[in-house]
A protein has these predicted regions:
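Helix-biased detector of long, well-ordered alpha-helical tracts
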Residues: 1-133
Length: 133
């Protein structure tokens, strides 16, 4: 199985942003009962106007996180872009007879939330100046 996730920063700390991006990307594999194996980084970062050390911290946070879970970084791609974005394409393995999907949900199933509902909406509102932290 393969998945791709990348997004703009949702926290101010570059290292934490890298960690969150890595977890968000490999979580898609875990959510379907798979095992993440390899990842490729995708980053959009401006060539001018932003300290390159910030990208280094983003990458360090992401790499330490994927390594923690046994995922091997095998490559990636970067794009010169005004808006910083970061994430991973993750390849995993899964038993085709044990794939967990949203379509299999039933009334009475237990839902496990890993963050508060509405976090993404609030984060977007803060970025657009429509909400405060």
């Amino acid at each position: 199985m393969q998945t791709l996730d990348f997004f703009t920063p949702i926290v101010d700390d570059p290292y934490d942003y890298g960690r969150i991006a890595a977890l968000n990307s490999i979580n898609d594999v875990w959510a379907m009962a798979g095992t993440p194996i390899t990842a490729m980084a995708i980053t959009c970062f401006p060539k001018k106007g932003v300290d390159p050390a910030i990208l280094g911290e983003i990458m360090r946070g992401g790499l330490e996180t994927i390594n923690k879970y046994g995922v091997t970084l095998i490559g990636g791609h970067s794009v010169d872009n005004e808006q910083i974005m970061f994430g991973y394409s993750v390849t995993g393995i899964i038993d085709p007879n044990k794939v967990a999907t949203n379509s299999g949900a039933q009334a009475g199933d237990v839902l496990i939330l890993t963050k508060s509902i509405g976090t993404g909406v609030i984060s977007t509102g803060i970025k657009k100046g429509c909400a405060s932290d």
